[in-house]
Amino acid sequence: MWIGIISLFPEMFRAITDYGVTGRAVKNGLLSIESWSPRDFTHDRHRTVDDRPYGGGPGMLMMVQPLRDAIHAAKAAAGEGAKVIYLSPQGRKLDQAGVSELATNQKLILVCGRYEGIDERVIQTEIDEEWSIGDYVLSGGELPAMTLIDSVSRFIPGVLGHEASATEDSFADGLLDCPHYTRPEVLEEMEVPPVLLSGNHAEIRRWRLKQSLGRTWLRRPELLENLALTEEQAKLLSEFKTEHAQQQHKHDGQA
């Protein structure tokens, strides 16, 4: 997969190219990341990249010419088929389904805004899609871009150490992930659930699915509204609710 970055601070992306899962993907040739800074496309000695907005108001906008030239340079390097994405709080909110969609693209160009944003005409003429990582304000598009790169790269074959990891992540099937445990078996009198030590893979799968359903019901119930539960899932969720109610009753009785 090839990803082009348009950013005033391309050095920030060393966090992606040099470390962790994405760093290994770059090292192994599974992910290629190139960057272009609008500053390199300025024509004045101050390398100016911001300009005042028409109509007044606080803040500045990214200057049109350097930004467009940087995007054009990235498009030329990418060749045919590159999708241009602007990281914007006004875009579609990124979720696992969206990540899965974006991962089908072999070439992405990510435009990172700064200041108060970019000229609307640049969005209309150069941008294919706008994406957001949440309803809050950041100083620029670099962190959202890194979030997108990290999440999308997990779908590239060979990137993860275990091929099932991406499909078993939280949200991969519309549910939160189940609890996980490692050594020691007992930590401050808290024991690993016996089923995980049983070696019975069918029961382990059933337990994990029940916990995943239950955790989603407790923490993100709105996610269940969009799911058509199978007969097994409905039964497991019902069991979880009963067990949870019993635990709450026991806890209340001890309080």
From Swiss-Prot:
GO molecular function, one term: tRNA (guanine(37)-N1)-methyltransferase activity
Keyword Cytoplasm: yes
SUPFAM superfamilies: alpha/beta knot
Protein family according to the UniProt entry: Belongs to the RNA methyltransferase TrmD family.
Location of the protein in the cell: Cytoplasm
Top-level taxonomic group: Bacteria
Role this protein plays: Specifically methylates guanosine-37 in various tRNAs.
Binding site for S-adenosyl-L-methionine: 113, 133-138
Catalytic activity: guanosine(37) in tRNA + S-adenosyl-L-methionine = N(1)-methylguanosine(37) in tRNA + S-adenosyl-L-homocysteine + H(+)
Cited Pfam families: tRNA_m1G_MT
Gene3D superfamilies in UniProt: 3.40.1280.10, tRNA(m1g37)methyltransferase, domain 2
The name this protein goes by in its record: tRNA (guanine-N(1)-)-methyltransferase
CDD domains tied to this protein: TrmD-like (cd18080)
Alphabetized HAMAP family for the sequence: TrmD (MF_00605)
One GO-annotated biological process of the protein: tRNA N1-guanine methylation
InterPro entries documented for this protein: Alpha/beta_knot_MTases (IPR029028), tRNA_m1G_MeTrfase_C_sf (IPR023148), tRNA_m1G_MeTrfase_TrmD (IPR002649), tRNA_m1G_MTases_N (IPR029026), tRNA_MeTrfase_TRMD/TRM10 (IPR016009)
